[in-house]
From Swiss-Prot:
Catalytic activity field: 4-(phosphooxy)-L-threonine + NAD(+) = 3-amino-2-oxopropyl phosphate + CO2 + NADH
Compartmental location: Cytoplasm
Species assigned in the record: Yersinia enterocolitica serotype O:8 / biotype 1B (strain NCTC 13174 / 8081)
Record's cofactor remark: Binds 1 divalent metal cation per subunit. Can use ions such as Zn(2+), Mg(2+) or Co(2+).
Name of the protein in its database record: 4-hydroxythreonine-4-phosphate dehydrogenase
Domain of life: Bacteria
Further remark: The active site is located at the dimer interface.
Coiled coil start-end: none
GO MF annotations in UniProt: 4-hydroxythreonine-4-phosphate dehydrogenase activity; cobalt ion binding; magnesium ion binding; NAD binding; zinc ion binding
Record-listed a divalent metal cation binding positions: H167, H212, H267
Length: 331
């Protein structure tokens, strides 16, 4: 990696939550890349003081060569916050600030100014309370990048789970799963496992939608009418697919030891297993974007803000994975 390709942009997320704490904790060690934090400088300096941690900020200079990040320092891409932040207390006046940091970081990642984007947790409810329609990071970045399809995947060192659908009510899931959508999702998953994870021939295990994967049509017809035909077409294109398998049996070592990724049909089908197995060590990845995006696997934890007790493990894992994905993409 060279110059701007040695830069990762970070958004701390909700200012009243643990995001700023975790970014400051990241700064307490050396990093081989430049960490450019898109945030209000005063917010970070105040929070560092509250945490009794050293922090020096240097302003981001796009035209200068990227520098490895030294412990105790961060590079700042400034965005001014609207109202004073009280740790643990949401303020609707700061919702536009949160969205502005996401937009600024996303635009820099799209342009190639940054090699990857790593996000801290946001509070979706307070953003919507401000009158800003916001489903989540995944959908926001997809819309801003003009991507008609992206794929949400969570990963630990041992397991990767991608989703055929994301933040939908359960009632809406069957209608959202079509042969076209599965073709798009699985093609993105297969491509990004190759290009961003360095897996030359990924093997993807696919969950059925219904109990027992439909039990031959006795517990639903989506497998027979949609999932099985879609997988057959994709296999003809050279994608290694196993399934559809019942979700309650797929998540066993005899299957997972061979799986480079699992495709779950909906959010709560696959993610509870992954989070139980590796909560605090999991990373949220958005596949199909024109840039690398990783994130923590937890929420804003308002009650922990400025207490010094927040666990930085997931943020460190997300940042390390982003660096690894950058290296894989450059090979």
């Amino acid at each position: 990696m060279q110059n701007h390709n040695n830069r990762i942009v970070i958004t701390p997320g909700e200012p009243a939550g643990v995001g700023p704490d975790l970014v400051i904790a990241l700064a307490q060690q050396d990093w081989p890349v430049e960490l450019v934090v898109c945030a209000d400088p005063a917010l970070l300096l105040t929070r560092a003081s509250q945490l009794n941690l050293p922090l020096q900020l240097r302003e981001y200079q796009q035209d200068k060569p990227a520098l490895a990040q030294l412990a105790g320092t961060l590079t700042i891409l400034p965005v001014k916050i609207a109202a004073e932040v009280i740790p643990g207390q949401l303020d609707v006046k700061n919702s536009h600030y949160v969205v502005e940091t996401l937009a600024k970081a996303c635009d820099g990642a799209i342009s190639g100014e940054f090699a990857a984007l790593v996000t801290g947790p946001v509070q979706k409810s307070i953003i919507n309370d401000a009158g800003i329609p916001f489903i989540g990071h995944t959908e926001f970045f997809a819309d801003r990048s003009h991507c008609s399809r992206v794929v949400m995947m969570l990963a630990t060192e041992e397991l990767r789970v991608a989703l055929a659908t994301t933040h939908l009510p359960l009632l809406a899931v069957p209608g959202a799963i079509t042969q076209t959508s599965l073709h798009e999702v699985i093609s993105i998953l297969d491509n990004d496992l190759k290009t961003k994870f360095g897996i030359s021939q990924p093997q993807i295990y696919v969950c059925g939608l219904n109990p027992h994967a439909g039990e031959g049509g006795h517990m639903g017809h989506e497998e027979i009418e949609t999932i099985i035909p879609a997988l057959a077409t994709l296999r003809q294109q050279g994608i290694n697919l196993i399934g559809p398998l019942p979700a309650d049996t797929l998540f066993q070592p005899k299957y997972l030891q061979h799986a480079d990724a699992v495709l779950a049909m909906y959010h709560d089908q696959g993610l509870p297993v992954l989070k139980y197995q590796g909560f605090g060590r999991a990373v949220n990845i958005t596949l199909g974007l024109p840039f690398i995006r990783t994130s923590v696997d937890h929420g804003t934890a308002l009650e922990l803000a400025a207490t010094g007790t927040a666990d930085v493990g997931s943020f460190i894992t997300a940042l390390n994975l982003a660096i690894k994905m950058i290296n894989n993409s450059n090979e």
